[in-house]
A protein has these predicted regions:
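Hydrophobic (often cysteine-bearing) scaffold residues that line and stabilize catalytic clefts
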Residues: 10, 53, 108
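Short secondary-structure capping/junction motifs at helix and strand boundaries
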Residues: 120-131
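Pan-zinc metallopeptidase signature
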Residues: 129-192
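Post-HEXXH active-site segment of zinc metalloproteases
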Residues: 31-36, 66-108, 129-137
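A metal-dependent hydrolase signature that marks the N-terminal structural subdomain at the beginning
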Residues: 1-27, 167-182
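Short pre-active-site segment immediately N-terminal to the catalytic Zn-binding motif
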Residues: 5, 40-55
Length: 192
């Protein structure tokens, strides 16, 4: 049997997974944003029925790694939401090792890529469907290789944010196995 990439059944499987972990996802014909076929809309994901599975995973990853208290800021171009999140954090007196501070500085594109890979592996998808060769400026194959070798930089960011371990030890499994799928850490009540 030949595996087919980007089938409706696989896309539905990914969307169901995202909804189950708390990332709201819905179909919307013509949805498009920073990536073709997918739009981040105030912390939710709108997906065109023909969108690549890899795109759904990656854009969903951006929402999953963003702390829940800031997800609604993520809308369209993520950079504006991330800048606002950093501005808010700058007004607090949190120590850089505070869990929220650590989470905020670890939700960039490499972490989203590593998260998407882990989610795709969890769902049993082949590597060339999780990250396509023509993605990442044509470097998809190289990024896939780095992920397969567990040497991709985003893995370290996920570990720093608490999502996973870098290496197996003391009975803890390592990435791509995750301790949790969404960043739930919130603003401490004493933060100003």
């Amino acid at each position: 049997m030949n595996y087919r990439i980007d089938t409706p059944g696989t896309r539905e499987k990914v969307m169901r997974f995202l909804n189950e972990i708390g990332i709201p996802v819905r179909y919307e014909i013509g949805a498009t944003g920073f990536t073709e076929g997918c739009r981040i809309d105030h912390g939710m994901l709108a997906v065109d029925p023909a969108c690549r599975v890899s795109t759904v995973l990656h854009e969903g990853a951006h929402l999953a790694i963003t702390p829940r208290c800031f997800r609604a800021l993520m809308n369209g171009n993520l950079f504006a939401g991330q800048r606002e999140m950093l501005r808010i954090m700058g007004e607090t007196d949190l120590h850089p090792d505070d869990p929220l501070y650590r989470a905020v500085i670890q939700c960039s594109d490499p972490e989203a890529t590593a998260w998407a890979w882990a989610a795709g592996i969890e769902l049993g998808l082949p590597g060339d469907e999780i990250i396509r060769d023509d993605e990442y400026g044509g470097d998809g194959e190289e990024i896939r290789l780095a992920l397969q070798m567990r040497s991709y930089i985003g893995v370290h960011g996920l570990a720093h944010a608490g999502f996973c371990e870098i290496r197996e030890r003391n009975g803890m499994v390592a990435w791509p196995h995750m301790k949790f799928w969404t960043q739930e850490v919130g603003m401490p009540e004493t933060a100003s």
